[in-house]
UniProtKB/Swiss-Prot annotation:
The gene is dabA. It comes from Thiobacillus denitrificans (strain ATCC 25259 / T1). Zn(2+) binds at residues 460, 462, 719, 734. It is a peripheral membrane protein. Part of an energy-coupled inorganic carbon pump. The keyword Thylakoid does not apply. HAMAP family: DabA (MF_01871). GO terms for molecular function: zinc ion binding. Its cofactor is Zn(2+). This is Probable inorganic carbon transporter subunit DabA.
């Protein structure tokens, strides 16, 4: 049976829409920070958090005890918290005799354990009786109520196996997940495993089907996969068949698909990203998408259901399950209690025996006794919780006087309040931070400089740049700027001796320009030796047998790596560098190739391929070929002449042999006109036109307000990290560069900005760069705090005399930054900076970067809290504790607001992703984060699992956001502050739909500080509210809405 095309397309559309709540997961080597609830950003923040709890079984707010700890530490605005409670109470019915505001504020601040969900069996009359010390009123619970409770765990779309696990303890879900994970590991492996799934080029579903049909282990278990796969040879057809066999109504297919995909949302997110990443090498070789993945999951799930039905008599479809529950609700209820972990401990043994006996009469006798006991316990516990709360609020007597109807209203009200309390705490903590930051911004016009600075330094907006910028500025004549770390130049980079492109830009952008790295000098012998040794190392380290075969293969060198990088990383690194010297000096190819140059390159490549083909196919060595023979073969393969007569005659090839060889040149070696056109098109992507070069330099300078007063040195500082034995290393690199180092983008812009032709064009546009200004690329290692200059051999001779001063200043800032930062990493502050030894702290930072045993080489972007867009003068006098993204911006250089819109649409969106990833990883590290690094194992060279088999861990590890099991990262939504006239900033925000929606839906906080009016404007409750700039923290209640 083959499904009709229209039906197949409908199923594909359903699957892709069902997968939209699942965030993309990029390979670990280019880790991209992302919002775990990115697919729900169209919803208000609170609604998305609630849906995330249902889909991913994860919490979206910190527990109350942690919030109370923040309150005790003075990190919560108590006034705002009380106002949140008052607003909630204004919409609630009154409860006679109770001061609800005081009661609920006491619940928040003085009761550590939440009251939890209301009782399921005990009602208000039962609780009232306990409060009065009376016996519970006699009451029989109807079977319909029990069936309803069971039905609440069986919503439409929930997979049948999940219901069976709950009612019968089958653990089908865990078994299914294990089989699916193993299948994914086999198919998606990128060279880690010794064995890869055969036939992967056919795609995930076809390759897996071929293996599954022959899988003896599955057949012996009774999983007759082959019978299911025989129904249809397409994944869409199999999906339709399985859903029909399960009896799932078509209206519920979407919810069912979403439940299936979110079960292992890490794997689903990786497949979802991979299927759309057309440039990704492994996607092109071995295609896969969510339809393939879902079909495999449904096939295995149906096979497991049938296996359990045959062996244990469990229902095999939804209709059978419904009949089972309806025919014996008592058994269904007790099964749910026992297998769902709700059973009363004192009656657990009796319930287990009754379920195992499978005799309706026995469960019917046990049920009334169980229900009565549970009703009594629920009533007593709830009464005790209410009494404890009321007494702490000074309302114990008032609680005793409540009638049953009042108790019912109070219970429902408390449940609604606890559902919303996370939002209230978050708003109060965010108000506290906003109240600390906004009034401290300096809006005074800056004094004109007496002289130009010694150096101007552009850093990435990354929060880790804030510390080193501050220390560099304190040293003296340095002016710093913040700009997105790709410097506004999206490039696709082909590094030295690399064969693939790396996108160095935010993932929301797609680069169209390719940059090549070329070596200046090279020693052929050294290159051959080093590349061979490096290949040996790569193969050995990649092998699962490496701990055993390395000593036999190349002595103790690899073993020394393990010990040296753990016990003496600095000394060992210096010794190791003598074996692995730095790569040769390089230049970047930035100018467009002419058509003649491109065609010449293609001709050279074709000639080289022809020589290779002749040697491989015909066994003819190069020295026997003349240039004319090679030309003949090339022209024949391209169809420019009929045959290569001279070549055929020289080597005595008959007509068939000659024709066959020429066809091989076309088909195997791709020497044909069509492929030549494709190569010409690809070569056309290399470099930038002069107009593009002028545009990128001008845009970068205008976006940060640097259009005049250029100093002798302008440093473009990209950043990245270095750490050993760290799968999350790319998470510490530059997010604006796609999880890569930013030095290449810095070199690109510096090389362009130093061109005379580019400067001449910029001068026509009003940007006059001084004749003695030189742009120098630099690299900020965020793990060691080192600042390193690049391409110094290009410096004009006139600048050489100043380089020592420049390097010394950068080194001093690095040491001071390390002294500050290392205190946050050590258990005791004195460990990092004993006796003010900043050099010692710097050495410790370098040691951490080289230590294989170091699980936290740096904190990364933890504790990020705000994104400030404005002049450095507004924040220059503040110690922002490495918590703020700083993007330089001068509205006076941007009369139409286009530059501000670009900052909002690009860098701010990336910052919001970073912020949300840290937020959710800190709030619930077990589900949104990735747990402890200690238990991580690499999966297929592209991801991380916990233990040997798990879902792909998609968030940040505990060591990045937690310290001593408590959040080190304070989870706050990103506070975005724009320093500009309010109308100017508001127009820009409204002009960027993505940011406007994030603001309206509460995914970030937005504020504008107007330097002309000295007012602050904060977007709250769907509108802008005006505050005096220097009194934001005191103006919570005195709000003026701006229409």
């Amino acid at each position: 049976m083959t499904l009709a095309l229209g039906r197949r397309l409908k199923i594909r559309a359903l699957v892709h829409v069902a997968g939209e709540p699942i965030p993309y997961f990029w390979p670990m080597r280019t880790f991209i920070h992302h919002n775990p609830l990115y697919g729900l950003e169209h919803l208000p923040f609170e609604q998305a958090v609630a849906m995330g709890e249902r889909l991913f079984r994860a919490h979206g707010f910190l527990p109350r005890a942690r919030q109370q700890a923040y309150l005790a530490a003075g990190r919560v605005d108590a006034t705002v918290l009380a106002a949140q409670v008052a607003r909630f109470c204004a919409d609630q019915p009154e409860v006679a005799g109770l001061d609800l505001e005081r009661l609920l504020l006491t619940l928040l601040t003085d009761v550590e354990t939440p009251l939890g969900a209301p009782p399921t069996l005990a009602d208000a009359a039962d609780v009232h009786a306990v409060l009065r010390g009376a016996a519970l009123p006699a009451r029989e619970i109807p079977s319909g109520a029990l069936a309803a409770q069971v039905g609440s765990d069986m919503p439409p779309g929930r997979p049948l196996y999940a219901m069976l696990d709950l009612l019968f303890g089958t653990e089908i879900g865990a078994t299914l997940d294990e089989l699916v994970i193993k299948s994914c590991l086999d198919f998606f492996d990128e060279g880690q495993s010794v064995w890869q799934m055969p036939g992967r080029e056919q795609g995930l579903f076809r390759a897996w089907s071929a293996v599954a049909r022959r899988n003896l282990r599955l057949f012996i278990r009774g999983l007759h996969i082959k019978r299911i796969l025989a129904v249809d040879d397409t994944p869409e057809g199999i999906i339709s068949h399985v859903m029909g066999e399960l009896g799932v109504p078509e209206d519920d297919w979407m919810n069912h698909f979403t439940c299936e995909l979110t079960r292992l949302h890490g794997w689903a997110g990786f497949i979802r990203w991979r299927s759309g990443a057309k440039h990704y090498h492994w996607t092109r070789r071995y295609p896969a998408d969510l339809v393939d993945y879902l079909a495999i999951r449904l096939v295995l799930g149906l096979a497991l259901l049938r296996e359990h039905a045959a062996r244990a008599g469990t229902p095999a479809n939804l209709a059978e399950l419904a009949r089972r529950v309806e025919s014996n609700p008592a058994e269904a209820y007790l099964c749910r209690e026992f297998h769902g972990g709700r059973v009363l401990p004192e009656m657990a043994h009796a319930v287990e025996d009754a379920i195992a006996a499978r005799r309706p009469a026995r469960t019917a006798r046990l049920l009334p006794r169980y229900l009565e006991r549970k009703r009594e316990i629920e009533a007593r516990r709830h009464a005790q919780s209410l009494t404890r709360l009321a007494e702490r609020a000074g309302m114990g007597a008032a609680l005793q006087r409540l009638a049953p109807d009042d108790l019912a209203r109070l219970t429902a009200l408390l449940a609604r309040f606890e559902d919303e309390e996370g939002r209230m705490w978050l708003a109060a903590r965010e108000a506290h931070y906003m109240g600390r930051l906004l009034p401290c911004l300096d809006l005074a016009p800056p004094a004109p400089p007496e002289k130009r600075p010694f150096a101007q330094v552009m850093f990435c907006i990354d929060v880790r740049s804030e510390r080193i910028r501050r220390h560099l500025e304190k040293l003296g004549s340095y002016q710093t700027f913040g700009i997105a770390g790709f410097f506004g130049v999206p490039v696709s980079f082909i590094g030295l001796e690399k064969g693939s492109e790396t996108h160095l830009c935010p993932v929301v952008a797609t680069p169209k320009n390719v940059v090549l790295e070329l070596a200046i000098t090279r020693n052929a012998d050294d290159e051959a030796f080093v590349s061979t040794l490096e290949q040996v190392f790569h193969e050995l380290k990649a092998s699962v047998l490496s701990p055993f075969i390395t000593v036999e293969a190349i002595g103790l060198l690899f073993g020394l790596d393990m010990f040296g990088k753990s016990l003496a990383p600095l000394a060992y690194s210096r010794w190791r560098e003598r074996l692995h010297p730095d790569k040769p000096d390089t230049r970047l190819l930035l100018d467009k190739l002419s058509r003649e140059q491109a065609e010449s390159i293609i001709r050279s490549l074709q000639r080289a391929l022809i020589v290779k083909a002749v040697r491989r196919e015909l066994g003819i060595p190069r020295e026997l070929l003349t240039d004319e023979m090679i030309r003949e073969l090339r022209e024949t393969a391209l169809g420019n002449q009929a045959q290569a007569a001279g070549f055929a005659q020289r080597f005595e090839l008959d007509c068939d042999a000659e024709t066959g060889f020429v066809e091989r040149l076309r088909q195997v070696y791709r020497i044909d006109r069509g492929y030549a056109r494709l190569q010409l098109e690809r070569l056309g992507r290399i470099g930038f036109t002069l107009d593009e070069q002028v545009h990128f330099v001008g845009q970068a300078l205008r976006s940060i307000g640097l259009v005049s007063g250029f100093s002798r040195f302008v440093l473009l500082t990209g950043h990245g990290s270095t750490s050993e034995n760290n799968p999350y290393e790319s998470a510490l690199d530059c997010g604006a560069c796609g999880g890569n180092h930013g030095i290449t983008n810095a070199r690109v812009l510096a090389q362009i900005a130093n061109k005379t032709a580019v400067r001449a064009r910029l001068r026509e546009q009003g940007i006059v760069i001084a004749d003695d200004t030189w742009f120098v690329p630099a690299f900020h290692n965020t793990t060691t705090d080192e600042l390193r200059l690049y391409d110094l051999d290009l410096l004009p001779p006139s600048h050489l005399v100043y380089t020592e001063r420049l390097i010394n200043g950068l080194q001093a800032a690095s040491h001071l930054c390390a002294a500050e930062r290392m205190r946050t990493l050590q258990d005791t502050p004195g460990d990092a900076d004993e006796n003010g030894d900043s050099a010692g702290a710097y050495r410790l930072a370098r040691r951490n970067a080289l230590d294989w045993s170091q699980v936290r080489p740096e904190w990364g972007l933890a504790r990020n809290a705000a994104f400030v867009i404005g002049r450095r003068d507004a924040t220059g006098g503040l110690d922002l504790e490495g918590r703020v993204f700083l993007h330089s911006y001068d509205y006076r250089c941007d009369p139409r607001g286009r530059l501000l819109e670009n900052i909002l649409a690009g860098p701010l969106v990336v910052g919001q992703w970073i912020n949300m990833e840290h937020y959710f990883s800190a709030v619930d590290n077990a589900h949104y984060g990735s747990g402890s690094k200690v238990y991580h194992n690499i999966a297929g060279r592209f991801g991380v699992m916990t233990g040997n088999l798990s879902d792909l861990r998609t968030g940040l590890p505990a060591q990045t956001v937690l310290k001593d099991s408590a959040p080190y990262h304070e989870p706050l939504r990103l506070l975005t502050v724009i320093e500009a006239p309010f109308a100017h900033a508001r127009a820009a925000v409204e002009g960027v739909v993505k940011v406007k929606n994030l603001m309206h839906n509460g995914w970030l906080r937005m504020a504008v500080v107007d330097p002309e009016t000295r007012f602050a404007y904060v977007f709250e409750d769907g509108g802008w509210r005006q505050y005096p700039h220097d009194a934001v923290s005191e103006a919570v209640e005195e709000k003026e809405t701006v229409l």
